[in-house]
Structures are given as C-alpha cells and as structure tokens.
C-alpha cells in the first residue's frame, strides 16, 4: 500500500454537494451505471495517454500495454477500478474531484424540477462521471500519479460523499489511477464478479482499451479416468471484445446495441430518438455514427460550452466535442466520426481549416438533415417531438449554412392562421400546397407572442381574403427570416413591412377602390402628417385594415421592430426607427376624428399612433403621456 503523507481536509464546492445529494437520490434505481461511468473515465484516461504518446513515446516508460482493470475484494467489500493511463497531478485532483468546472452549472441546477424521474435524466445528461461512485459506495479512495509530470508524486483523495474530502501526497510507483469503492450495505450485488462482467459487456463492449478482470487460478487436478490435468495460473482476462461498434457491419448490429452505445457515448439514460450509421469511401474515407437525442442537452443554449461529436482517427480516440465536425445549429447531435485520413497527432487548430475536416463535416451534416427529412415524412408525431425540443436551434441554420439553406427550410415548422393554437406544425411545403391561385408570396408575421401575432391588425385583410399567414413568435424568428427570404422560388414577405402587394389576389375592383379612397382622403392625410410631425416617417391610406382604425408599418429599408428589440436585449445600439402610419378611412373612429378641431384632432391622432405602436411593439417609450392623453379624451367624450 502507498504511504500517505499528511492528510488535508477541504470542503466540496457547493455545486458538488448539490450534485452528490441529487445523484444519490435520483439515480438510486439505476445503480449499475456507476461502473459504466468509471470504466468509461478510465478508458478515456488511457486514450489520452495514447494520444499524448504519439508525440512523446517516452511517456509510456516500460508499460505501453494500456488497460483498465476491475477487481473485487469480498472480504473488505471493495471494488477497485484501475487504469495505467494519463493520471492526475494534485492540482488536477483538486479541480476535477473537488469542484465542477463546467460553465453553465448554475443554469443546470436551475432546470431541476424535484421530480426524481425527470431529474435523473437531466443529471445523466450533465455527466455524473466520477461522482456516480457514491451511488453504491459510502467511501471512495482515489490514488493517482500523472504520466505527464515526471517529478510528480502520487496523490490520494478520500471522501464519504458528504461535505468534505481529504487529500495527501503519497508514493505511488506506477502512473495512472486507482479508484477504490467501499460498498454500502445494500450494494452486495456488485461483489458478484459475474454481475460486474455482465455490466461491462453491456456498456463497455465497444471500448478499444481492454477492460480486464482477474481470472482465478485453476489448481492441478485429475479427470474421470485418473489422468493429470494441469492447473492454470491466475491471469487478467479481457472482458470486452474491444471491437468498436461503429466498425462493424450495420446488418450485424442490433437496435438494442445501437441504443446502449448511445447511452454510453452521450451519457444519457434515455434511448435516442433516431440514429444514422454510415461508412464513406472515396476521396475521403471515414465512418460516422450520429444520434438525435430525445431530450435537449442541459447546456444546449450555453455557447461557452464546446459542442460537437467525438473524433477518432483509425479507431484511436482523439478528442471529445470536435465542434469543427458539426455546424453549430446541429449542436444537439451526439455520436462520433472516425477518420482514416487525418494524422493521429491532429489538433483542434489543424481541424479548423482542413479539407478532410470540411468533407467530413459536409457529409455528416447532410446525413443528419436527410435523417430528419425522412423522420418528418415517415412519422409526423415523432418529428413534432423533435421540433418542439430542438426547433429553435435548427432555426439558426439558414444564417449559418447557406449551402443547405433549402434543406433546412424544408424542416422548419411554424404556427399559422390555418390552424387554431400555437403549435408549430406547418411546413413551408404545407403552406405552398394551400396557396391561393395567383398567390406568389409566402406571408408571415413576427411578434412577441403567438397571441400578439394572431391578433395583429395587419392580418385583417388576409383574414378577409382567406390568405394563410405564418405566425412567428420566438426570439430567434426575426433573425431567421432575415436570412430566409425565398423558398422554392417563392418570396417570403412580412405583412408588417413595406408596401403590401397582393398581386393577382387583389382584383381590379379592389385596386380601383383603393385608389379612389386615397384620392378622397388626401387632405386628411396631410392633416394627420401635420398633427404627428416627425413622430412618423409617412402617413398613408391602408390596404391592410378592415376592422382597426390604424396600424404602423416598418419601411423596407429600416430595421424591423423585432430585430430592433432583439438587438436592444443584447445591449446593442439601435438606430431610431420612424414608422409608416397607415389609416383606415372607413373606420368610425377615424370618421369621428375628422370632425374635431385641430387641437383635439392632434390628441386623437397621437392616441391612435400609440395604440398602433402598442399593437406592433408591445410597449411605448412614454406610456405616461399616452395615459394622460387618453384620460383627457375620455373626460371630454
């Protein structure tokens, strides 16, 4: 046993205490995952040393046979998971076992609901890793020595998974890490070596690093005929096959194997929604195995967090979260890419601008989009589940990926005036199929909420004529539509921007009536312009309104209302926008206004402008003045 120095006691970071408490209680029904997590971590440590040794073979010393070993001591009620991988320094131990260094940790804890079933899935996505040891152990001891620091001593870390841990320098002869679990009274099942072998076969079969368990010696004996049978010495026996699942033929892999592999690679307790396994040969040769999760990863909206798939080169693990292999708008995709062409000593910098990387990224992106297109066609209910979970991320696609813009647009879903309710289920193809004869544009509106969009006065003429309008109300929607201006040769047109041109949907009689109304109202328009002054860009007769007295419209050359609000929320400077004020001459309120004296008319005009601004923006710069004017007019009514 290693000789320990003076033990120092330290308190866990607050988040670690929370995670330990939640995990021990939420994951209790799935206790066996502790071995999956610890063996996976040990395999990663061996993989990391193998990668480092590509540029410095001396790191192996006299021990280049990388492995993970799992052993049981029934007398002391312990399980030990050992590796001869990269190991840890004292600082590594403090940072990795005493704190949670992940950014977005506070947001993660904020998502927890108190529902054990839901929280267990979320905790699994967060990555329980090492701390899963405390599901089955009431004390954990870690002994480790770094392979990267020749002068480093060993380190021992010890904790009972409560408020604190102890740490000390020790003498440890060999590099790598030993994790000793002192099992709880109710964890006897894990003292059964056959039980542990079964768990390793279930979760770790694909690992390229051998996972070994001790095979007891067989003493010399005699057979039934009295012949001598030689004994066999005890030895470390490899339990997993070591054949990476993705290297096997698809026809030889069961759905159950794909699902179990997903749980390992994604650290998720749920099964995946769907997956795609592809071997690409030709100029660039690689294999990818890509999964779409059922649930959003907890850190989906944390842009500081690296996202991406795992990268292997010729079955050798290179890195996690290789974001260069998958566009940001597909950051929910889990899985791996295994290249036959990249060098083993590849770095993130080399990946950044590399034609092999680009080919793998483009190929993997198309596979994911094809997978989603097929799901949308074959199973609308499952696709709706995907869209409700990941739709807002996919909406980033048209801005990021010009090449696949049309493919992404086919996958988008929207709420619409065609349906009741805010469910986003209408595709652009659905819309085009329902377009009226002579209609050449796809009409949409962006607002703060579904209700604000559905009840916006600018929809009145569309409702009257039975023209469908897409209703957009997510924060990202204005950004999306600024990059998605056309689909299948149909222009996308906001109903609250610029001149409204319904083309052939306006018959000659409608156009003649509009021109006649504009001419008859010309003097009154001048009166409105004088009353409102520089508060508006222009006043004109509307061809959008049938029930409302007025509305405001953004000029084609100005920033839209929703884009301005988006930039303001991000702390960006936004130029002041003056709106076009459209008036409905037929409305009784407008007719009544025209009989008022100029001072009163001015008050009414400003109230109408404020009302129209509220309907479009949802807020006013000076609500107090609006209330004062309205009170005054009501008193004089």
Curated annotation (Swiss-Prot):
GO terms for cellular component: cytoplasm. It is found in: Cytoplasm. Pfam families: HATPase_c_3, HSP90. Keywords: ATP-binding, Chaperone, Cytoplasm, Nucleotide-binding, Stress response. Transmembrane segments: none annotated. Its main location: cytoplasm. GO terms for molecular function: ATP binding; ATP hydrolysis activity; ATP-dependent protein folding chaperone; unfolded protein binding. InterPro entries: HATPase_C_sf, Heat_shock_protein_90_CS, HSP90_C, Hsp90_fam, Hsp90_N, Ribosomal_Su5_D2-typ_SF. Residues 1-348 are annotated as: A. Belongs to the heat shock protein 90 family. Molecular chaperone. Has ATPase activity. Homodimer. NCBIfam families: PRK05218.1. This is Chaperone protein HtpG. It comes from Idiomarina loihiensis (strain ATCC BAA-735 / DSM 15497 / L2-TR).
């Amino acid at each position: 046993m290693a000789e320990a120095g003076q033990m120092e006691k330290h308190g866990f970071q607050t988040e670690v205490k929370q995670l330990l408490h939640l995990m021990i209680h939420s994951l209790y029904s799935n206790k066996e995952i502790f071995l999956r997590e610890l063996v996976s971590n040990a395999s990663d440590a061996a993989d990391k040393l193998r990668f480092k040794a590509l540029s410095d073979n001396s790191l192996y010393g006299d021990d280049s046979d990388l492995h993970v070993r799992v052993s049981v001591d029934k007398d002391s009620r312990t399980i030990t998971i050992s590796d001869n991988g990269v190991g840890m320094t004292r600082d590594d131990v403090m940072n990795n076992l005493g704190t949670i260094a992940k950014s977005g940790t506070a947001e993660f804890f904020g998502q927890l609901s108190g529902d054990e079933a839901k929280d267990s899935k979320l905790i699994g996505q967060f990555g329980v890793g090492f701390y899963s040891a405390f599901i089955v152990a009431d004390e954990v001891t870690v002994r480790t020595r770094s392979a990267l620091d020749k002068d480093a001593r060993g380190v021992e870390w010890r904790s009972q998974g409560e408020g604190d841990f102890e740490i000390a320098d020790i003498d440890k002869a060999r590099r790598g890490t030993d994790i000793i679990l002192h099992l709880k009274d109710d964890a006897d099942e894990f003292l059964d070596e056959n039980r542990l072998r079964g768990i390793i076969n279930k979760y770790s079969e694909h690992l390229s690093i051998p996972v070994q368990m001790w095979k007891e010696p067989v003493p010399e004996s005699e057979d039934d005929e009295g012949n001598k049978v030689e004994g066999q010495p005890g030895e470390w026996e490899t339990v997993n096959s070591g054949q990476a699942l993705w290297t096997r033929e698809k026809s030889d892999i069961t759905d159950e194997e794909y699902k179990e592999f997903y749980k390992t690679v994604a650290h998720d307790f749920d099964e995946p929604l769907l997956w795609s396994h592809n071997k690409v040969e030709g100029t660039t040769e690689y294999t990818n195995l890509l999964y779409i999760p059922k649930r959003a990863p907890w850190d989906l909206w944390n842009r500081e967090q690296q996202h991406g798939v795992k990268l292997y080169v010729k079955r050798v693990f290179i890195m996690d979260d290789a974001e260069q292999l998958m566009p940001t708008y597909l950051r929910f995709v889990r899985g791996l890419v295994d290249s036959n062409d990249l060098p083993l000593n590849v770095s993130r910098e080399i990946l950044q601008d590399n034609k092999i990387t680009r080919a793998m990224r483009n190929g993997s992106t198309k596979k994911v989009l094809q997978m989603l297109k097929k799901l949308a066609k074959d199973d609308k209910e499952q696709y709706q589940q995907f869209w409700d979970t990941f739709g807002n991320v996919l909406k980033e696609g048209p801005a990021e990926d010009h090449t696949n813009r049309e493919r992404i647009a086919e996958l988008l879903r929207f709420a619409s005036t065609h349906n009741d309710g805010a469910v986003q289920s209408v595709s652009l193809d659905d819309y085009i199929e329902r377009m009226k004869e002579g209609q050449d544009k796809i009409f949409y509106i962006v607002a703060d909420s579904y209700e604000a969009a559905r009840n916006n006065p600018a929809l009145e003429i569309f409702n009257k004529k039975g023209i469908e309008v897409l209703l957009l109300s997510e924060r990202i929607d204005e950004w999306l539509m600024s990059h998605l201006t056309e689909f299948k040769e149909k222009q996308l047109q906001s109903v609250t921007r610029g001149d409204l041109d319904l083309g052939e949907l306006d018959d000659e009689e409608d156009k003649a009536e509009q021109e006649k109304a504009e001419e008859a109202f010309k003097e009154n328009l001048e009166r409105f312009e004088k009353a409102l002054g520089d508060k508006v860009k222009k006043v004109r007769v509307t061809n959008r309104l049938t029930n409302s007295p007025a509305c405001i419209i953004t000029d084609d050359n100005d920033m839209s209302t929703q884009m301005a609000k988006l930039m303001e929320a991000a702390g960006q400077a936004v130029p002041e926008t003056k709106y076009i004020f459209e008036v409905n001459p037929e409305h009784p309120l407008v007719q009544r206004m025209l009989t008022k004296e100029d001072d009163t008319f001015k008050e009414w005009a400003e109230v109408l402008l404020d009302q129209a601004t509220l309907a479009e923006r949802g807020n006013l710069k000076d609500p107090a003045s609006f209330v004062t004017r309205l009170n005054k007019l009501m008193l004089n009514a």
